[in-house]
Amino acid sequence: MKKLILVTSPPACGKTFISKQLAKALNHVVYLDKDTLIPLSKQIFAVAHQPYDRSSIFFEKYIRDLEYRVVLDLAMEALEYDDIVLINAPFTQEIRDLDYITILRAELKKKQAELVVIWVDTNPKVCHQRMIDRASDRDMWKLNHWDEYILGVNFNPPLSLKLENQPDSLLIFHNSSNEEFEESMKTIVAQLEAAVADRVEIPRTRY
């Protein structure tokens, strides 16, 4: 059984670093990052004569869902050619929408694939500092309105996604310290390796 892995969490929890390390550790992986689409999204802002603001109503209405649709279309195509596709993206709304997840799982089943959600669990104070340190233009509104922003962010894992008959349906990656990262990395790589090996013969991971 092939796997579509979504590495998800609120911004600045460490998704990108974790996603890349997981992709390096596993075999037969296609790595996709939704942020790769940002240059195209910036052009939409420019053509529409809108200020570049990924927290704006314009972004939510015309760009956000399109980015997710494109990266998922790429993932579905990639599953035709490899065993695992890993997407680095927040999916903050989608993973709380059980209808969305049900439809996605049904589409994956047609490709003999399963959905794996890896939730990156990070202390909000750590996320705030990481956001300051990375100084990205996409975080400007969040940092300037931190108290307002943080009230609307759900840092709880989406436990409703856990399936009894699929142990790797929801995996929690703790990432508030280097020690948590190392322990979670070893544990989750082993879980993913075992889940894929149960169905597909692949070499051992390199982690």
What is each of the regions a protein language model found here?
Residues P10-P11:
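The conserved Walker
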Residues M1-L4, D82-D83:
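Pre-Walker A (Motif I) flank of P-loop NTPase domains
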Residues V7:
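Hydrophobic anchor at the beta1->P-loop junction of P-loop NTPases
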Residues D121, I132-M185, P203-Y207:
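Small-molecule kinase domains that catalyze NTP-dependent phosphoryl transfer to phosphate-bearing small molecules
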Residues Y62-K111:
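Glycine-rich phosphate-binding loop used to anchor ATP phosphates in small-molecule kinases
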Residues G14:
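Conserved glycine(s) of the Walker
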Residues F17-V70, M76:
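Conserved substrate/cofactor phosphate-moiety recognition/catalytic segment
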Residues K109-M131:
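Conserved phosphate-donor/acceptor-positioning beta-strand/loop module used by diverse small-molecule
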